[in-house]
Curated annotation (Swiss-Prot):
Protein name: Hemoglobin subunit alpha-A
UniProt-listed Gene3D superfamilies: Globins (1.10.490.10)
Binding of O2, residues: 58
Pfam families for the chain: Globin (PF00042)
Keyword Heme attributed: yes
Superkingdom: Eukaryota
Organism: Francolinus pondicerianus
InterPro entries xref list: Globin (IPR000971), Globin-like_sf (IPR009050), Globin/Proto (IPR012292), Hemoglobin_a-typ (IPR002338), Hemoglobin_oxygen_transport (IPR050056), Hemoglobin_pi (IPR002339)
Entry binding sites for heme b: 87
Cellular-component GO terms for this entry: blood microparticle; haptoglobin-hemoglobin complex; hemoglobin complex
């Protein structure tokens, strides 16, 4: 459960992230594909090379969804309901991949905003990413 402090921390860090959505999203995806090669199986039609327009485009969508969830932090489930349906019923993405991408996204934020990612903000962002992952996998059951 996200506390009031967590919600403020998440909104604050996303204030710094939002203008870099495409770059940070692409960087997180590239990290995930390299670190966890099995995640590439969901993107057989993508050019997964560094700087690929497809990876950048999908990265922008990923971070846009995270920004939307942060903007509606009291209703993450409602905000991401359609995305949850898509990933559970059509794309059938293995639920563990949301956690892997979340970890990669945390690394990207740490690289680009080291002073902003205090231990408290890190913990809040991790809780938020776990909450998003839980919402995206809720319809698998």
């Amino acid at each position: 459960v996200l506390s009031a402090a967590d919600k403020n921390n998440v909104k604050g860090i996303f204030g710094k992230i939002s203008s870099h959505a495409e770059d940070y999203g692409a960087e997180a995806l590239e990290r995930m594909f390299i670190t966890y090669p099995s995640t590439k199986t969901y993107f057989p039609h993508f050019d997964l090379s560094h700087g690929s327009a497809q990876v950048k485009g999908h990265g922008k969508k990923v971070v846009a969804a995270l920004i939307e969830a942060a903007n509606h932090i009291d209703d993450i489930a409602g905000t991401l309901s359609k995305l949850s349906d898509l990933h559970a019923h059509k794309l059938r993405v293995d639920p563990v991949n949301f956690k892997l991408l979340g970890q990669c996204f945390l690394v990207v934020v740490a690289i680009h905003h080291p002073s902003a990612l205090t231990p408290e903000v890190h913990a809040s962002l991790d809780k938020f990413l776990c909450a998003v992952g839980n919402v995206l996998t809720a319809k698998y059951r």
